[in-house]
Amino acid sequence: MSLLNTPLHELDPDVAAAVDAELNRQQSTLEMIASENFAPVAVMEAQGSVLTNKYAEGYPGRRYYGGCEHVDVVEQIAIDRVKELFGAEHANVQPHSGAQANAAAMFALLKPGDTIMGLNLAHGGHLTHGMKINFSGKLYNVVAYHVDETTGQVDMAEVEKLAKESRPKLIVAGWSAYPRQLDFAAFRRIADEVGAYLMVDMAHFAGLVAAGLHPNPVPHAHVVTTTTHKTLGGPRGGVILSTAELAKKINSAVFPGQQGGPLEHVIAAKAVSFKVAASDDFKERQQRTLDGARILAERLVRDDVKAVGVDVLSGGTDVHLVLVDLRDSELDGQQAEDRLHEVGITVNRNAIPNDPRPPMVTSGLRIGTPALATRGFQAADFTEVADIIAEALKPSYDADALKARVTALADKHPLYPGLK
């Protein structure tokens, strides 16, 4: 048999075994990393299609390679669907990731040395919002804003004060670990007052926006970036939305400014995921995502959990994630992550504002509900998993008993039963 037509398990059993093991891990445990989700089978089929073979530098109707008539159709479908989904004037679906979408947007709007404002990384921001070792911190002068120590929410008075003092060229509104909604209208007002562009990074909450369960930043921002996984639940990739006025700058910054050939197989998967995101089923799933996060937050602020030094930042959540404060607990973030992993729940340790511990240890956990909602979890299931987490964070936890409860939930909601 030609190697061209040899199945993976025959051609490369080592890689196949690792893939099989990962499938088993996803099926048998509970995924609660806030940035992770499960892509529909149709999305994975599109991403694994023959479109992976096609080079297509340029844009639909304006390619530098022949034979692009079919990938042109696919890419235009993705563009049209995401524009309609979010009410955008322009969309570029070629960025390979959210980080590359952010980089391209900044390259389109800024010059090296310009000033940008973004949420401090330790207060919930993202690497690409101005971290010193990231391109954004190396190319631009960064002024960081923070959350209020009392409320745990972004301090808009500080944002306005810093903007007036530093006169940034770009203000970034968005986050990677923040449990509340942002006031996009207030951010735009401040941006207009100082002559800045407003860029919103909605990578984490784009699915909630698509479902109408979170304010849409598109009417307020000059540019909006997002990933296509996380709450959107599609393939790993990025998208840039903008005003029509900025379309040419955005497109040029992506290609040829930052990328060469687009990944048309991933763009096909994006197109499928945008169709899914417009469905009633998706909207219902996003509601369960929100409900699950609120159930979790409510369980983790009860007296029995507070008694062991565990608390919830900002007192709750408006989105798909909960940030757990372990500063008064006997556990640090790494230990808490390991303990939940022991019972079959995957989360990530996360720095919190004014964290006294180093970044690889941390004093916090970031726990999300999108993957469980995609798996079919209902309110009663989220109540059960919230109780498992609460019990696991106590000194007297019973690992075997908690793992049995996790296994029961995983068995109740089988994942990808047709995959082997």
Curated annotation (Swiss-Prot):
HAMAP family: SHMT. Pfam families: SHMT. It is found in: Cytoplasm. One of its GO terms (cellular component) is cytosol. InterPro entries: PyrdxlP-dep_Trfase, PyrdxlP-dep_Trfase_major, PyrdxlP-dep_Trfase_small, Ser_HO-MeTrfase, Ser_HO-MeTrfase-like, Ser_HO-MeTrfase_PLP_BS, SHMT-like_dom. Its EC number is 2.1.2.1. The gene is glyA. Gene3D superfamilies: Aspartate Aminotransferase, domain 1 (3.90.1150.10), Type I PLP-dependent aspartate aminotransferase-like (Major domain) (3.40.640.10). GO terms for molecular function: glycine hydroxymethyltransferase activity; pyridoxal phosphate binding. Keywords: Amino-acid biosynthesis, Cytoplasm, One-carbon metabolism, Pyridoxal phosphate, Transferase. This is Serine hydroxymethyltransferase. Homodimer. Pathway: One-carbon metabolism; tetrahydrofolate interconversion; Amino-acid biosynthesis; glycine biosynthesis; glycine from L-serine: step 1/1. GO terms for biological process: glycine biosynthetic process from serine; tetrahydrofolate interconversion. PROSITE patterns: SHMT. It comes from the Bacteria. NCBIfam families: PRK00011.1. The record marks 229 as: Plays an important role in substrate specificity. It is an enzyme of class 2 (transferase). Its cofactor is pyridoxal 5'-phosphate. CDD domains: SHMT. Belongs to the SHMT family. The keyword Amino-acid biosynthesis applies. It catalyses: (6R)-5,10-methylene-5,6,7,8-tetrahydrofolate + glycine + H2O = (6S)-5,6,7,8-tetrahydrofolate + L-serine. The modification N6-(pyridoxal phosphate)lysine is found at residue 230. Catalyzes the reversible interconversion of serine and glycine with tetrahydrofolate (THF) serving as the one-carbon carrier. This reaction serves as the major source of one-carbon groups required for the biosynthesis of purines, thymidylate, methionine, and other important biomolecules. Also exhibits THF-independent aldolase activity toward beta-hydroxyamino acids, producing glycine and aldehydes, via a retro-aldol mechanism.
